[in-house]
Structure formats: C-alpha cells, structure tokens
Amino acid sequence: MTQHDRLLIIDFGSQVTQLIARRLRELNVYCEIHPYQNVTEAFLKGFAPKAVIFSGGPSSVFAEGAPMPPAGVFDLGVPILGICYGQQVMMHCLGGKVERGHGTAEFGRAFVTPTAERLAILDGWFEEGREQVWMSHGDHVSQIAPGFQVFGTSPNAPFAITGDPARHFYAVQFHPEVHHTPKGAKLYENFVRLAGFKGDWTMGAYREEAIARIRAQVGDQKVICGLSGGVDSSVAAVLIHEAIGDQLTCVFVDHGLLRLGEAEQVVKMFRDHYNMPLIHADESDLFLGALEGVSDPEVKRKTIGRLFIDVFQKHAADVGGATFLAQGTLYPDVIESVSFSGGPSVTIKSHHNVGGLPEKMGLKLVEPLRELFKDEVRALGRELGLPESFIGRHPFPGPGLAIRCPGEITREKLEILRRADAVYIDQIRRHGLYDEIWQAFVALLPVRTVGVMGDGRTYDYACALRAVTSVDGMTADYYPFTHDFLGETATRIINEVQGINRVTYDITSKPPGTIEWE
C-alpha cells in the first residue's frame, strides 16, 4: 500500500481544529489530529510527520498546567505552523514573550497589513494591500523569539504573522481555517507546498488501500453491517462488499419511520443493483406499538435506540458465524473519542446507533471510513459508483420521522407527514434548489386548525416547512425562499395531501433553535 506523507495537527483545544484538517484534506494532504497530551517524543518518532501544525485553544500560557507542545517537536527538522494559541505557545517555548490580554483582545474580523519583507507562505496574499482575517485571542505576543521576523500586523496584534524562514517555523495570531479568513486556504496551500507534500491523498487511492486493509483484517470470516440507508453506512457496505463479496450480509431494520418509498429504494439498490445478501427486517409494528402514546422526544429517541439493538441482534443471529460488525464510523467520531478534554467517547450518531453492540454480540469491528470526513465519504461514494441522487441526499436523523412529528405518533400522522414531505422535496428539486440547501423537511405540528375547502369547513393539521443552509450542521440559517415558491408549495401540499389545511415556514436560525424540531 502507498505510504502517504503525514501531517500532524497537535490539538490545544480549539473549537475549529477539525476545520484545519478539512482544509488540508481538500488539498489532498493526509493529516491526523491528536490532543497535545497524547503526543510524546515516542509518538512523534513513530508518526514521523512531514510537517506539524499547532492548533488554537482557550488556554493562556500563563495558566498553571497550560498545554505545551511535546519535547523534541522543534528538533524534528520539519516545517511547523502555529495558529492563535499555537503562535503564543511557540513564542513562549522558543524565547519570545507573551502578554496577558489587557485591552488588546481581538474577537472577530480584523485586517492584517504586510511589512516590507515578504514570505513564501504568503504567496497570493496582500495583492490589494491588506487581508481580512478572523481573530479570537485574549493574550498576545509582545516579543518574537530569536530568528523570527514580522511579516504582518493588525491594530491589536503587532505580530499577527511571524516566521523564521531558515527553520520553516511560521506563526499567525488569526484563524486561517475559518471562512471569515478568505485567503486562509491559500496560506495552508503554501505551507504544504513548502513542506514538500505530494498531494496524493485521493479517494481513488483510499479505495484501493481500504479494500486491501479489509481483506487483511477479515480474511475468510463473515461480516454483518447495520444498513440504515444513510450515506455513511451505505458507502461502508459497498466498499466492504467490493472487498469480500458475499462474506458480508447487511441487516436493514425498517422501523416504520422512514420517508415515502425509502425502504423500497434501499432494498432495490442493495439487493437488486449491488446483489448484496440483505436481510430486510420490517419491524414497523413493533416500533410503532412501543411508541404509542409517547410524546416526550427523549423517550422517543431512547425507545427507538433500545428496540433497534434488540431487533438487530435478533436478525444478525440469523446470519450465523459472523465475527465482525461493520460500522460507518467517521473521523470526527474518532477525534471526539480521544478529545482534547480527555472526556469519554461520544455515542456515534448514526441512523442505526449500534453503540454497545460489538461487546454484547462478541464481535470485532470493521470501520473502513474512520479516517474520513463526511465530504470525503461522499467523494468515496462517487468513486464507488453510488448514484449522485443518493450520495447528495440531505441528512436524515436516526429516529426518522418520529422527531419530525412533535407529540404523539400515529400511523395516520406519519402517512400525512410522508406525503407532505415528498411534495416539498419535489418542489425544491423542480426549482433546482436541492443542492443549495443543507437540509429540508416538513414537520407535522400537533395542532389542528380550521379551514375552508370548497364550500365546506375543514379541521386538519398544520405543518411547518424547514430549510436551512449550513457548512457542518453546527450553525445554520434559514433558506431565503421567494414568496412565490412558498405560496406554490403551500398550495400543492394543501391540494395534494389530505389532512393538512395550513402551511407555515420556520425561519429560526441555529442557534437559538435546532435544525430538527425535536
């Protein structure tokens, strides 16, 4: 297998460290994030990074037990880039000075102007005199370390960009990874170019390497995969099937909370198109029976999660002889499990939510996507030939329509919701807006309203349309549909879906709201 050059990101606790990794992956550079306390001299020797980045973080170098880089990192002889706290800790360790933030803190947009000296890492910068950047710091560097020069300043950060070109050490006080620093990606591009990365991290290469790893790990043993119909588990299943063929059996649990025609689409694609061994477990009666009378959203989630584990175990036992369980774990899940704070692993938020299953069933894990971000999973899906209509689908929550139907769930409500949602998504696609929107759906509200249709009075449900734009789902804003679009959509839903006589549009951002209603 190809040995990729590797870049190490040492995490000092920034909320946006994952964005650094995503920017580098977009440049076809393989990188890993590791919390500072796990990076020892022995780790550095084994990892053998071609370059190192120090992330930002909330700490102060003056605090007792402040996060510090590992001994020996400055002696590796590789380029190092320090960001925000990473700059401060670099200066602190190499002989510069840092001052507490008394009246010089910067949070938000700032403008950096260049000095007379130019630096190769800043190629493409300052073509129009100054550059917008995003600052988020209290303390600041007051004296640079020996060997460093100043290459950019801002009103409250006189050492906004510093560097020691001889040692290829660079440090900036701002965050180049966020989109509020428009030329931040260019800075990362320059850094990896100066470090000599080949840019050979592609999904084509990953596909070949992952297949080889799966075959080596599994041998001639059997694997079961909880298939949800979501992108992650589907890409994992197709990749594993390409590696080991019919040694893989997928278990698709239909809990009766899927969208219109979704179960049939999943079965058709995986059983008929990909010819995978597939157990289609229609357990909708079990799930809907258990949810009868339940209105609390947390109770809904826990009930669905508990039943899924029971049902999955029952049907997986039918496979017989399986020794591996496949999961669509992604790199953000792995990062969180070894987080900066040292906190416990988070539950993997997948549709099938199989947390605890490997231990209960005595199975070993196969996680072929654990090195990838979501956008890379989609790219791998395209590489594997999954249809674009499937790869580009909006996120869908694990509990399904249960959390888009506030209050008690009934079969009647679910059917109304499915049909309204199908009309809404069809409208969005007809107008060519689907790919502009992060997520769109209908929520069926637990209220009935009076209406007039023809010459008669109606007393039917109200629904809310939801559509948001987002980069990662952490924050979101409502999509600015035209009034004509909303009017046309409301008319179609009321005319085509029996049981709804009023349509509203939810214009709440996240925060303060969440994307889903429950």
UniProtKB/Swiss-Prot annotation:
Q: What class of enzyme is it?
A: ligase
A GO cellular component annotation in the UniProt record: cytosol
Alphabetized UniProt keyword annotations: ATP-binding, Glutamine amidotransferase, GMP biosynthesis, Ligase, Nucleotide-binding, Purine biosynthesis
* Tagged with keyword ATP-binding: yes
Residue numbers binding ATP: S228, G229, G230, V231, D232, S233, S234
Q: Which GO terms describe its molecular function?
A: ATP binding; GMP synthase activity
The EC code for this enzyme is 6.3.5.2
Looking at the record, the residues that make up the GMPS ATP-PPase domain are: 201-393
What this protein catalyses is: XMP + L-glutamine + ATP + H2O = GMP + L-glutamate + AMP + diphosphate + 2 H(+)
Q: What range(s) does the Glutamine amidotransferase type-1 domain occupy?
A: 6-200
The keyword Ribonucleoprotein appears for this protein: no
* UniProt cross-references to CDD domains, sorted A to Z: GATase1_GMP_Synthase, GMP_synthase_C
Tell me, in a sentence or two, what this protein's role is: Catalyzes the synthesis of GMP from XMP.
Quaternary form?
Answer: Homodimer.
Please give the name of this protein: GMP synthase [glutamine-hydrolyzing]
Which lineage do the record's taxonomy fields give for this organism? Bacteria, Pseudomonadati, Pseudomonadota, Alphaproteobacteria, Rhodobacterales
- Whichever gene encodes this chain, its name is guaA
